[in-house]
Amino acid sequence: PGAVLTDVGSVKQSVIDAVGPHVPEGVHFIPGHPLAGTEHSGPESGFATLFRDRWWLLTPLPGTDEAAQARLLALIRGMGARTDTMDPAHHDLVLAVTSHAPHLIAYTMVGVADHLSRVTETEVINYSAAGFRDFTRIAASDPTMWRDVFLHNREATLDILGRFTEELFMLQRAIRMGDGPLLHDYFGRTRAIRRGIIDAGQDTAAPDFGRAQRADGKPDG
């Protein structure tokens, strides 16, 4: 009794539905999600600054014990993370935008390159420009984990993919019609959003997504 139970999964509502009914009386279940990590998995992929200045979201349930939540927050902040709280369903929608859909799109882009018969696998590997390398880096992520993420955050992911498809069709029409002003305006607006991510301290303007490689091969920061 009095123990605090949390998790670090990328989907919250399904975890609450699955775990919540089985939490023993007196145990404080406070779901969480650190927005940190790389495309690599397992304990060997950890490093000392993994959580430094990264957001760690908590999705506490109604009636969560304030003292228990304070203890968990102290632990998280002690690892250098920033904290915030969020409704579980809203968390899943936000992460569908910022993480889940981007991973699925990255997997798809690699799949397109793999199935394009006029471009060989060797050419894709040898001549990858920075855009392809940077954009598809996350396609190296663990397939088992991401299969489960998509299946357990199905509705939010499908919602965002539908919106993405509409935007893509709009850009497709603009390119087909030679609508340069529309493209320039669109890219300008989205560029400003990207700069906002840097200004918020969630990345840097340095190459390689702001993760310079250290001598041991792990990302620095």
Predicted segments, located by residue:
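Rossmann-like NAD(P)(H) cofactor-binding subdomain of soluble oxidoreductases
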Residues: P1-E44
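Short, solvent-exposed amphipathic alpha-helical segments in soluble enzyme
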Residues: G20, F47, L73-G78, R189
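NAD(P)-dependent dehydrogenase/reductase Rossmann-like domain
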Residues: E167-L168, Q172-G221
